[in-house]
Design a protein with these regions (language model features):
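Aromatic-lined, polymer-binding surfaces characteristic
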Residues: 1-164
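Carbohydrate-active enzyme catalytic cores, enriched for enzymes
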Residues: 82, 124-218
C-alpha cells in the first residue's frame, strides 16, 4: 500500500520517499548497525521505485505527470544521503544523482500547454515549489552549483504576490480554489510559507514583507 509504482493511491509512498532519507540523515548516529541496514535498504527501495516511475513515463520527454514531478528530488536526496553506504552500491547512487541533476538542470520546471504557464497552477504551487528545495540546497551547499539561479525560481515570488496573499482573488490557470489557514486542506497544501527561500533570495520588497508576515502552519 506504500508503493510508488502500483495503481492505487501513492500519497503514503510519496511521503515516505520524501521524509525517510532526511530523517535518517538526522538520526543515523543514534542507530544500531542493524537499524542502519534496515533504514538504508528501505531508502534504496523507495529510490528505486522513484527511478522506475520516471523511467516508465520517460519523464524527460513526458514531464506532465504531477506526482512524478516530485520524485526526482527524493531520488537525489537518497543518492546524497546514502553516499558511503556499505549496503547500496556507489554506481547506483551515482545513477540516481545523475538522473536527478539531468532533470533539474534540463527540462524542469516544465510548463503547461493550453494554460500557457507553469503546469501545476496556483493552488499546487505552494507545495510543488517546495518538494525539491532540500535537494537543491544540498547540491548548492556541497558543490556551489545553484539550481535556483534559473529565471523561474528568481521570479516565482512575484507570481505568488497575485494570489498567495490574504484577500487576493486572482486564481490563474482555472484552479478556482485557494486554501486559507482556517481550511482543513491547509496542512497538506500550504505546509510551508510559499514565499520562503524565493522571496528571501530574489523577491521584491513586497514579497519579502509577506514572507515575514505569512502565518505559520499549525
Amino acid at each position: 500500500p506504500c508503493s510508488l509504482i502500483y495503481p492505487w493511491n501513492d500519497e503514503i509512498g510519496l511521503s515516505n520517499a520524501r521524509c525517510l532519507p532526511i530523517v535518517y540523515d538526522l538520526i543515523r548516529d543514534k542507530l544500531t548497525d542493524q537499524q542502519i541496514y534496515l533504514a538504508e535498504k528501505t531508502i534504496e527501495a523507495y529510490a528505486l521505485q522513484c527511478e522506475e516511475r520516471l523511467d516508465k513515463l520517460d519523464f524527460t520527454a513526458n514531464p506532465g505527470d504531477s506526482h512524478a514531478g516530485r520524485v526526482p528530488a527524493y531520488m537525489g536526496d537518497a543518492a546524497l544521503i546514502l553516499k558511503g553506504s556499505a549496503y547500496v552500491k556507489e554506481e547506483v547512487l551515482m545513477r540516481w544523482l545523475e538522473k536527478a541533476l539531468d532533470i533539474y538542470g534540463g527540462i524542469f520546471p516544465f510548463f503547461g500547454t493550453s494554460d500557457g504557464g507553469w503546469a501545476e497552477g496556483s493552488f499546487y504551487s505552494t507545495s510543488y515549489t517546495k518538494w525539491y528545495l532540500p535537494f537543491f540546497l544540498a547540491v548548492e551547499r556541497f558543490s556551489g552549483f545553484r539550481l535556483l539561479d534559473r529565471p523561474f525560481y528568481q521570479r516565482v515570488s512575484q507570481f505568488f504576490l497575485h494570489f498567495a496573499v490574504k484577500g487576493r482573488e486572482n486564481h490563474p490557470f482555472g484552479d478556482g480554489y485557494w486554501c486559507s489557514s482556517e481550511d482543513p486542506e491547509w496542512p497538506g497544501f500550504f505546509a510551508q510559507n510559499p514565499f520562503r527561500v524565493y522571496a528571501e533570495r530574489f523577491g521584491p520588497d513586497l514579497a519579502k514583507r509577506w514572507e515575514r508576515e505569512q502565518a505559520a502552519p499549525e
